[in-house]
Amino acid sequence: MKNLKTKQFQGLNGSLLLPGDKSISHRSIMVASISRGISRIKNFSNSTDCLSTLNAFLDLGVEIKKYGRDLIVYGSGLDAFKDPKKPLNMGNSGTTTRLLLGLLAGQSFNTCLVGDASLSKRPMYRVTNPITEVGGEFSLTGNGTLPITVIGHPSLKAFDYHLPIASAQVKSALIFSALQADEPSIIFEKEATRNHLEIMLNDFGADIKTNGLCITVMPRPKLSGRTISIPGDISSAAFFMVAASLLPNSCICLKKVGLNPTRIGIISVLKRMNANIEVKKTSNEAEAYGDIIVHSSNLHAVEITSKEIPNVIDELPILTLAASLAKGRTIISGAGELRVKETYRISVVAAELKKLGARIQEKSDGMVIDGCPKLQIPENNLATHGDHRIGMMLAVAALLVDTSKTITLNNPEAIKISYPNFFRDLDYLLNNPDMKG
């Protein structure tokens, strides 16, 4: 348990470097491992999830050396993995699991994937079904959850596949399978999703062409190791962006944050809500990054529709908090994807914020939120439910409760899944006078 800070009238102030983007960190190890030669990865995320990816590839025989936030990966190509001879532990990482289902489908050995209790409740059919359709094979439990054994087939066939849902993880798994096919493959997206893997693979020498929602993957590319600098994680930045918007007297600068167009939906939505946000782009690399400056503001309600959901899917918990204190009624729809996160996030976010007096109506694919002037003191402890993003959202929410009483958060350790130093960085911004607004 952790006692949360409350009643913060001085706001957040200062500059902060965010940890490396979690989505890019996962993919950087995978791409570096299937390339030939040495890759240097700078600002790798130290989140528990990304360390699960690191450990999985060590178990697959890849030589990786870690120096603080940087990695050196000695890649040997797509066909150089070694049979681990034991189950690969995915921890709590759905990204590691789903992407490995695609990558290992084309190997010459079988691999069993296991995970913790939370991950072992999450369905994997949404990945195994499409990969099975294109030639992969899996041995699953009756309900499609971990443990799963990937039956390796080193002769995968090319495919054309229409994704039934907007999911970057399913798309990425299919791309990894397509790299091991005998001919070019085509993937059709339902909605555009984060494209970090496509950008990175092309940077390493792959031939992947995107035309609207159509992605063509050429097989068996000659990938060469290179250096990657991972920008700050915008999904982690979102918690500070909302906190600074809601807390009076705030002025923060979040430095070198990733500004990939498929990830900046959080900025667009907050600006529509009347947030005072300025973005200063400082890099024009394939994965652009820049500084995000946020001042306090009075937020207004908005509507968030299914077309926006893929680009704010990880930020919906903290956006729900923002909507709970915004003027008017916010409607979120088309967010059924939240059913397959660490928790059923729609229900859990609504339940936890209702403890604080938020006015939320739960819908099958979203929420209706009526803004209230202030949050209340909860009668019971707040709980992360093992979900890192809910934990960080509740830590921000506690700052907005006008009380000298203690608010306690159960299972704060879950936050380490994506942001081990979250509370340290939050304390820094709460106690830093160098940019008083």
From Swiss-Prot:
Pfam families the UniProt entry points to = EPSP_synthase
Q: Where in the cell is it found?
A: Cytoplasm
Q: Which residues bind 3-phosphoshikimate?
A: K22, S23, R27, S167, Q169, D314, K341
Q: Name one GO cellular component term.
A: cytoplasm
Q: Report the function annotation for this chain.
A: Catalyzes the transfer of the enolpyruvyl moiety of phosphoenolpyruvate (PEP) to the 5-hydroxyl of shikimate-3-phosphate (S3P) to produce enolpyruvyl shikimate-3-phosphate and inorganic phosphate.
Its quaternary structure?
Monomer.
Q: What is this protein called?
A: 3-phosphoshikimate 1-carboxyvinyltransferase
